[in-house]
């Protein structure tokens, strides 16, 4: 597909045919084609045996209706109305090698034209086309003026140097290319972004290498501004987007998206509710205003200066970006690995990377502060609804809704953390978290060798993940979820699916002085295929009270269940005089494997065990008896054919069979010894046949 940046056309008198012939010229960096080249082109045209029909609409003349096809040319010095054009693009869109179509000269006017498959309308300098509909692969090449053009279903408009398109509407799969020196004003874009935000799609929508002004981008619409392009006063609604490689000025995002790529520049963008401005590495923006529920994202290597962040506006960035501006605290800055006075709310997030730092950070409702290991954040204020993401290798200190908190990245000790709303903290090996509160959508993760002290409180919707043996010297209060995990067995992680039988599984222990259940759950792994191994909860010297649900995932062979022996599989171990209340634990869901059901039992030693039931699962005898019962029924059905009453006539016969009875088998030794299980059933059938 050829879309040359500068193609111009002129009429030349052909003395051989005695007619005007259209000649195209390309303005390239090396200059125009020579007159010899034009002459050769005309000579080639005159050598065609059958010449296309050319008509000329003279100045002052008006032509109403008509169709152009088969490489016909219509040269318009006067005016036309209601023409249909279906020729001129047989050799590809906007190619100078094409012949045929409608040519609107200086002073010529074409109105209400329909350009359809393979059709081409060429509007030369000084010519005007109005109310044109271009569809099904037709195109309009513009060096003059086009007003109120509609592009439908692969309809294309090419605005060349000196050309002006105003009021163009680009519908599904339509395409407008504004080339260097071209101008498009008042364009409405309804296509180009069907593949998703910032997707690789340059075959529909508006491509700007020249200038686009006062553009409206609706849902599914896209405007791409190339490096030579400028877009001014663009309005983008939800579901529409703008890709900036050149310059975008005075853009308003009413739920729409603006993506500023490397070497792109956007100035004076206003981000309203639902809108995003994304500044990628090497991109730059200036004087952006973030209003409530709007969002500015600045990637590492991106730059945003003179930003105005109003209340409820979100800033998403990291200490590898450059951002300066004002917020409700005053002046703020991010750059050179340091952040100061940043406000995070309503989806905002600041990532403090290794070796970088942040100070005076306000994490308000919906905001997130993430501090990597080796990063440092001081004077942090986290209000209710704010989130902190860190591990014991980070250094963080400040206040939250519960009071003062701190993380010492050197010692690995943390105190007074409040984790909620997507916040998380990881206690690495050798680290310690004391007096931790995990709220709704908060996560506390402990590596092997991590430990807890004081009171660890898990609210409803909170999670604690154990990746190894963990010891708590204090109390655990659980209204959320505690999950034993195994980083080497993704099959069993998070999803609680049954792990592959050959997956390596390492079982872990959680040891705590006291456990108070508040309707929370502990998710444990168990092998029911004979190894009798399980994760284990150890109550050391204290007590287990309240109500805790135990949920087990069988990580052994899911088809093989083995009867337990002795006391069963110990899952709760009360040590050093610890006690467990009757009813402190219960199964959250049935546990089955192979032929067995398993139950949770408390023994006199205060420990809790999984045991297989003496009776097989109800499905086992049913499955074992199905074959015998089916064979009995088949024999009965076959024998029934001998018990029929019939009526015969010369041309037809009717047969009726009615039968009922009882089928059953006595217990003759039990299915454990291979016998058919005891079963009993009745049957009845009526069969009517005719031919």
Regions found by a protein language model. Give the residues of each.
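Gram-negative bacterial Sec-dependent N-terminal signal peptides
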Residues: 4-5, 9-51
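Intrinsically disordered, low-complexity Ser/Thr- and acidic-rich flexible linkers and loops
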Residues: 92-96, 192-202, 491-499
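Short loop/turn motifs at secondary-structure junctions and domain boundaries
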Residues: 2-5, 531
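Short N-terminal segments immediately surrounding and downstream of signal-peptide cleavage
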Residues: 54-71
């Amino acid at each position: 597909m050829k879309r040359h940046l500068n193609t111009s056309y002129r009429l030349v008198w052909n003395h051989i045919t005695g007619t005007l012939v259209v000649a195209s010229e390309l303005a390239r960096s090396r200059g125009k084609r020579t007159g010899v080249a034009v002459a050769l082109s005309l000579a080639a045209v005159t050598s065609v045996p059958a010449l296309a029909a050319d008509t000329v609409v003279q100045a002052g003349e008006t032509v109403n209706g008509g169709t152009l096809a088969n490489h016909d040319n219509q040269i318009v010095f006067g005016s036309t109305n209601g023409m249909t054009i279906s020729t001129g693009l047989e050799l590809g869109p906007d190619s100078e090698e094409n012949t045929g179509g409608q040519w609107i000269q200086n002073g010529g006017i074409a109105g209400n034209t329909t350009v359809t498959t393979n059709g081409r309308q060429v509007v030369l300098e000084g010519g005007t086309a109005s109310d044109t509909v271009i569809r099904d692969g037709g195109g309009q090449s513009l060096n003059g003026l086009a007003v109120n053009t509609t592009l439908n279903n692969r309809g294309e408009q090419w605005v060349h140097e000196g050309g002006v398109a105003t009021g163009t509407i680009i519908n599904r799969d339509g395409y407008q290319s504004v080339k260097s020196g071209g101008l498009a004003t008042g364009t409405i874009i309804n296509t180009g972004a069907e593949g998703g935000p910032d997707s690789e799609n340059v075959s529909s929508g508006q491509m700007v290498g020249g200038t686009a002004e006062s553009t409206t981008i609706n849902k599914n619409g896209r405007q791409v501004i190339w490096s030579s392009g400028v877009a001014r006063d663009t309005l983008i609604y939800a579901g529409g987007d703008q890709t900036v490689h050149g310059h975008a000025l005075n853009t308003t995002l009413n739920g729409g998206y603006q993506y500023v790529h490397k070497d792109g520049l956007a100035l004076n963008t206003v981000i309203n509710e639902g809108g995003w401005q994304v500044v990628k590495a090497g991109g730059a923006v200036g004087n952006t205003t973030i209003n409530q529920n709007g969002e500015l994202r600045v990637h590492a290597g991106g730059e945003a200066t003179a930003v105005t962040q109003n209340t409820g506006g979100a800033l998403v960035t990291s200490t590898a970006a450059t951002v300066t501006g004002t917020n409700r605290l005053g002046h703020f800055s991010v750059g050179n690995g340091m952040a100061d006075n940043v406000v995070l709310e309503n989806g905002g997030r600041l990532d403090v990377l290794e070796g970088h730092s942040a100070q005076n950070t306000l994490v308000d409702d919906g905001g997130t502060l993430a501090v990597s290991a080796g990063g440092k954040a001081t004077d942090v204020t986290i209000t209710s609804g704010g989130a902190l993401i860190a591990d014991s290798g980070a250094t963080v200190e400040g206040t939250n809704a519960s009071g003062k908190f701190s993380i010492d990245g050197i010692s690995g000790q943390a105190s007074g953390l409040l984790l909620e709303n997507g916040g998380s903290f990881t206690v690495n090996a050798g680290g310690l978290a004391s007096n931790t509160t995990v709220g709704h959508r908060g996560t506390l993760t402990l590596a092997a060798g991590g430990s807890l002290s004081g009171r660890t409180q898990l609210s409803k919707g909170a999670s604690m993940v154990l990746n190894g043996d963990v010891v708590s010297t204090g109390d655990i209060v659980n209204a959320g979820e505690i999950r034993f995990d195994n980083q080497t067995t993704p099959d069993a992680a998070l999803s609680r699916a049954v792990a592959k039988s050959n997956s390596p599984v390492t079982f872990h222990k959680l040891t705590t002085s006291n456990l108070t259940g508040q309707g929370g759950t502990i998710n444990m792994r168990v092998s029911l295929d004979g190894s009798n191994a399980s994760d284990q909860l150890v109550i050391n010297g204290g007590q287990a009270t309240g109500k805790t649900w135990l949920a087990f995932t069988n990580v052994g062979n899911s088809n093989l269940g083995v009867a337990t022996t002795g006391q069963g599989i110990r899952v709760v171990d009360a040590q050093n005089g610890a006690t467990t209340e009757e009813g402190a634990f219960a199964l959250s869901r049935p546990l089955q494997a192979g032929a067995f059901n398993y139950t949770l039992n408390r023994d006199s030693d205060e420990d809790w065990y999984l045991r297989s039931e003496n009776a097989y699962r109800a499905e086992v005898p049913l499955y074992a008896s199905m074959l015998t019962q089916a064979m009995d029924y088949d024999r009965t059905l076959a024998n029934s054919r001998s018990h029929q009453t019939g009526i015969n006539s010369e041309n037809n016969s009717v047969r009726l069979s009615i039968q009922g009875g009882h089928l059953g088998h006595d217990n003759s030794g039990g299915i454990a010894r291979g016998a058919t299980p005891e079963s009993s059933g009745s049957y009845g059938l009526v069969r009517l046949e005719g031919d």
